[in-house]
Amino acid sequence: MKAIKIAIDGPASSGKSTVAKIIAKNLGYTYLDTGAMYRSATYIALTHGYTDKEVALILEELEKNPISFKKAKGGSQLVFLGDEDVTLAIRQNDVTNNVSWVSALPEIREELVHQQRRIAQAGGIIMDGRDIGTVVLPDAELKIFLVASVEERAERRYKENLEKGIESDFETLKEEIAARDYKDSHRKVSPLKAAEDALIFDTTGVSIDGVVQFIQEKAEKIVDMS
């Protein structure tokens, strides 16, 4: 049976990572968390105090401490920078609020997109991000673009933070998500937008199971036809 490439894009907290992980497990595919890669680069910049004028230093640190993914005992995915487990560190609010400017740096995107494409070559992979269908995997057999209201996405992020023990204010989260939407969709390099051949799905009020079912049925149909 042919293994396809699945690209899931959308704004912050639209449910991309959650559904991508479930579908990858259901189909036996590899899940690549591209957002974690950009967050890792952001973590490096913040930890060392690097600015957008010091891209070479960020890339140097990425080379010395490459990004890797490992599975935890419970099946969850751990993110490492070299030997350092940064799984929780890259989800902190300071990283979330700075990832847009780091991910907009052309040199950072070029390096990480190169890594992502190399991993995806064999197929049987599902990636989520903001430019997977448009830039990283324009040849993906299935492209999905998830959207949801700012209110709902803020609610999701608030609940996620509670579960991780991260303090946050709901109204502040709404403002931050709206601001990030603007930054991501207006950046010069790989702006957030749906690929022309992507299926746009509004997840507002839709359960995770409902979104998973929609995407998985589309994927299985493509595989059956190939």
UniProtKB/Swiss-Prot annotation:
It catalyses: CMP + ATP = CDP + ADP; dCMP + ATP = dCDP + ADP. GO terms for molecular function: ATP binding; CMP kinase activity; dCMP kinase activity. It comes from Streptococcus pyogenes serotype M18 (strain MGAS8232). This is Cytidylate kinase. InterPro entries: Cytidylate_kin, Cytidylate_kinase_dom, P-loop_NTPase. Belongs to the cytidylate kinase family. Type 1 subfamily. It comes from the Bacteria. The gene is cmk. CDD domains: CMPK (cd02020).
